[in-house]
């Protein structure tokens, strides 16, 4: 990754895709196998470039827990890695007690008629900006995050217009001893790892994080609640985000009461 020499005499190279996709074809000529983690991301142009440069690579393995329903996405991945082989489902792993029990709760917030008419005919992004700037809605999310027992991951989409606001609201009302973290694209990688490690040792921490930083690839074994504070239309993002909460935890957590919100 950044800061390390790409030339090596080792048999195995572990790298971020950002460090590789601009390299010439000759760099890849000696590799006979490639393993792509989070393979659902390989439809991106940069990752596709890497795979197409591996012309002499005989063994191609892609690993993912989520594929979207679009035929195009599936065909792109088949072209890069080969036919899809489903090894096991999430439901099976839950039944085997290798993943945590999952409960999805849909909280339907009602708006009055005047407020509803304001966004009746607007486009998606305008509606997104409207609901994320709603003070009553944000306070409800704050109260929800504070009422939930256990470690909570609260995901947002817009950093300045939503994430920073939620973090401030939660931080102001949280008990001084309760740890509240804010993570977005500008957060240093080492700081993110430190936050992850601290949360694994806590019992009631709150992480306010952007989808881009904490919805995929982050492994927190002691995470009990995930709150989607911003809507998202991506099935993969939803499933990957839920996956953050499927790691097993030894701590039993009770649910918040309606009165606590």
Predicted stretch roles:
Residues 40-103:
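Post-DEXD/H (motif II) to motif III coupling segment of the RecA-like Helicase ATP-binding lobe
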Residues 234-249:
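Conserved SF2 helicase motif VI
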């Amino acid at each position: 990754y950044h800061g390390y020499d790409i030339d090596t005499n080792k048999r195995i190279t572990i790298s971020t895709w950002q460090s590789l996709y601009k390299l010439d074809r000759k760099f890849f000529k000696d590799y006979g196998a490639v393993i792509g983690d989070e393979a659902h991301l390989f439809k991106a142009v940069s990752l596709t470039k890497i795979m197409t440069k591996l012309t002499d690579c005989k063994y191609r393995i892609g690993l993912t827990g989520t594929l979207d329903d679009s035929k195009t996405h599936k065909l792109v991945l088949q072209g890069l890695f080969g036919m899809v082989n489903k090894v096991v489902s999430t439901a099976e792993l839950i039944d085997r007690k290798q993943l945590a029990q999952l409960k999805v709760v849909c909280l339907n917030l009602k708006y009055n008629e005047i407020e509803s008419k304001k966004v009746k005919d607007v486009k998606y992004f305008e509606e997104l900006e409207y609901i994320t700037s709603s003070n009553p809605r944000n306070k409800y999310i704050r109260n929800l995050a504070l009422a939930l027992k256990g470690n909570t991951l609260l995901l947002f989409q817009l950093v300045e217009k939503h994430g920073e606001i939620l973090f401030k609201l939660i931080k102001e009302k949280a008990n001084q001893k309760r740890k509240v973290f804010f993570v977005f694209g500008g957060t240093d990688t080492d700081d993110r790892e430190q936050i992850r490690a601290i949360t694994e040792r806590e019992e009631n921490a709150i992480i306010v994080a952007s989808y881009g930083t904490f919805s995929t690839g982050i492994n927190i074994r002691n995470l009990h609640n995930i709150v989607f504070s911003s809507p998202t239309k991506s099935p993969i993002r939803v499933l990957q985000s839920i996956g953050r909460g499927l790691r097993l935890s030894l701590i039993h957590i009770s649910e918040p009461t309606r009165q606590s919100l």
